[in-house]
Amino acid sequence: MENMVYDGPLKQYDTHLADNMGLTKVSGGEETNPAWTSEIDDDAFSGALKESLTAQGLLSDNGRYQLEVVMVEVDQPMFGLDMAVTTHIKYILSDRENGNAVVMDETIAAQYTATLGDAFAAVKRLRLANEGSGKANITALLDKLSALQIDPGEISLTQ
C-alpha cells in the first residue's frame, strides 16, 4: 500500500474541499492470489487513497463531499520483461448537503511500467507495476480535484 501513496508536493484545492471530503467506499479490486498474480485489492487502494487525501488536507470523517471509487479494470501483462499495468478507476464525488448531487464523475486511466532493472523476478515487477499504476491514478485524481472549482450555485473544472 505505501508504494501507492502520493508523496509529491501539496497541491492547491478549492477551499470548499479542504478537510471536507469523505471516502464512502472502494470496490472492484481483487485480492492477490499468491499462487497466481499480483492484484490491487480494495483495502490496499482505500488505505493509499485515504493516506494521500489526508496528506493533502482533504479527508474528513464527516465531509460534505463524498468520494466513491470503483476499480473498473486493471490491465496486466501475463508475462514479459517490462510489466506495464494500466488502472482504470472511476471516481464519483457527490455533495451530500445538496441531495447527493454529483460534483465530479471521472474515470481515470493511468499506466506504470516496471522494468527488469526494477526487479529481476517477474512477480515483483508485476507488483511494482500495480503499485506504480495505482499511485499514478491517485496522482491524476488529485490533479483533477485541484482543478475543481466549487461555487454553491455552480461546479466546474478549470481548463
Annotate each language-model stretch with its function:
Residues M1-D43, G47, S146-Q159:
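A structural "domain/chain start" motif
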Residues M1-Y6, S52-G57, A101-M104, A110-Q159:
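C-terminal/domain-edge helix-coil "capping" segments
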Residues Y6-G8, E30, K50-T54, V72, ...:
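Sparse, context-dependent recognition of short Cys/His-centered cofactor- or disulfide-binding micro-motifs
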Residues T15, T24, T32, T37, ...:
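Residue-identity detector for threonine
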Residues T32-I40, F79, F120-E131:
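Second-shell loop/turn segments in exported
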Residues A35-R64, V69:
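Mid-chain, structured segments of secreted extracytoplasmic proteins
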Residues Q56-D105, Q111-K124:
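Surface-exposed short loop/turn segments
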